Amino acid sequence: MKIRSPIVSVLGHVDHGKTTLLDYIRGSTIAAKEAGGITQHIGATEIPNDTIENICGDFISKLAIKDLIPGLFFIDTPGHAAFTSLRKRGGALADLAVLILDVNDGFKPQTYEALNILKMYKTPFIVVANKIDRLFGWEVHEGASFRETFSNQAKSVQQDLDNKIYEIVGELHKEGFQSERFDRVSNFASQISIIPISAKTGEGVIEVLAMLLGLAQEYLTEQLEIDENAPAKGTVLEIKEETGLGVTLDAIIYDGVLRTNDEIALMLSSEDVLVTKIRSILRPLPLEEMRDSKKKFRKLDEVVAAAGIKVAAPHLDDVVSGSPLRVLSEDTDVEQEILNEIDNITIDTEDEGILVKADTIGSLEAVVKLLREMDIPIRAADIGDVNRRDIINSSIAYDENELHGAIIAFNVDVHPNSEEDLNNSEVKLFSGDVIYQILEEYEEWVKQKQEDKKKSFYDAIIKPAKFVSLPKLVFRQSKPAIIGIESLSGTLKQGQQLINKDGHVVGSIASMEDKGETLPDISRGQRVAMAIKDAIVGKDFEEGDELYVDIPEKHYKYIEREFKDKLTEDEFETLYEFLEIKRKQDSDWGSFGLFE
């Protein structure tokens, strides 16, 4: 069995140096002009073992790395959006990952998100603490190993870096990982290695390459074994139009061999399987050749994993990014394999919930997994831009439950023809390219909606209140009774039903006035003239009596269960006076049943 190069993905927060690191690795290997050099693939860069050994020198021999691993295969598109898009059955396509962070900036939202995604896919990784050249007092040693450059720094600079490394160790510990600076790691199987580097000056990059090679050799050789004669397995990166070629697909082949004229099976956006024949397999020309040629690609008869290639074939328009790619063979029902994989990918949805849209299968799976962990129901989940059908579907969900009238859109846009539909609907769109932030915004929105709903509900509930009928201030005895009152607790509102101290209904508040002004409600301590519909002074109550707002039993239970802490002290006292009055008539009034 042949061992292929491990596929390496670089993740981290924006501006923390993902692209700079990849550019430096490519640049230094091209500049080295060693035998074999680098191979530029579609969407990836392969650095052979010989080149790494020549760059790393003695460091490789110190790690006792043998020539088991042919090289390192770096995915060119950095970031976790690319990481989740590149998937294979059972997890991420990347065998190893580099989590990069700015040593001066520490953990940022996308760092945590990348860490969660690595955790989700159980991908082995190293942490690269970048931008050591920005530490105060740092003396740059271009391209040097970390050990060499670190030993030439002032003690204060060394201490400063150590402090920052231990802050990273602390954050990783909070996230459930044991870690240490790479040269202090005692067990590479249980501790994450932190490598301080400068992607700009190249300091420490030697150790990054050597550590990746060493980890792959020590822990991944079995999963890197491939049968170079077996039908190819791969993952589609993207579908794109190329001048002179028509619609093509870019793919990473991670197992087996792919040949021109092979029949391949792919997944369509309709969740059907496309079988098509490869017309040509293409790889970019080396940079130096590209300058002297009008062509961008070189045609190949075959490629063996790991390889990043462009495929020209008929009918690729509706193939999905992230789709599995399989070569048809007599031994295996590949079409059924793809259908099985589609079944695994197809997201189980509920009758109610929010809508989820993403750019690729892998991204969709990652977003849905995170939503499931948050116990958020999903009505529909699909790949592609937000369209009119999505907005209609989400509007229906809103009518059933306004918290479900939301669309989570990761790395996709709203279709231009649907923007007006969205603006005219009640649907709330949460979109962006950082899953962590989108979900945080959604949670905040849900929380606010729930608080608003609770407040509206609380405002609508009849709450405890009472007043006293002031002596010698009876302006009319009945039809309606008009009396002078003083509010003793709570808020009295027009229309509220009133009871006396015996629990009998005396009537309802028709109106309240003060100095000729009609008042819809009054608070404790206010004195007003009150008209009480259906009440007769002297029969239903006397001057000087206290009257209570009549609270429906259902409202009392809501207050008791959910809103008791919102009552003022005087409202609280009035509630229990009112309860005593009610229980003189019915001892079970306000009691909770077994299932309440």
UniProtKB/Swiss-Prot annotation:
Alphabetical keyword list: GTP-binding, Initiation factor, Nucleotide-binding, Protein biosynthesis
GO cellular component terms listed in the entry, alphabetical order: cytoplasm
Region (G3): 76-79
Start and end residues of each stretch annotated as G4: 130-133
Residues that bind GTP: 12-19, 76-80, 130-133
Residue intervals of the tr-type G domain: 3-220
Molecular function per GO: GTP binding; GTPase activity; translation initiation factor activity
Region (G1): 12-19
Residue segments, region G5: 198-200
Stretches the record annotates as G2: 37-41
Function comment: Function in general translation initiation by promoting the binding of the formylmethionine-tRNA to ribosomes. Seems to function along with eIF-2.
Family statement drawn from the similarity comment of this UniProt entry: Belongs to the TRAFAC class translation factor GTPase superfamily. Classic translation factor GTPase family. IF-2 subfamily.
HAMAP family: IF_2_A
Protein name as it appears in the record: Probable translation initiation factor IF-2
Species annotation: Methanobrevibacter smithii (strain ATCC 35061 / DSM 861 / OCM 144 / PS)
Higher taxonomy: Archaea, Methanobacteriati, Methanobacteriota, Methanomada group, Methanobacteria
Gene giving rise to this polypeptide: infB
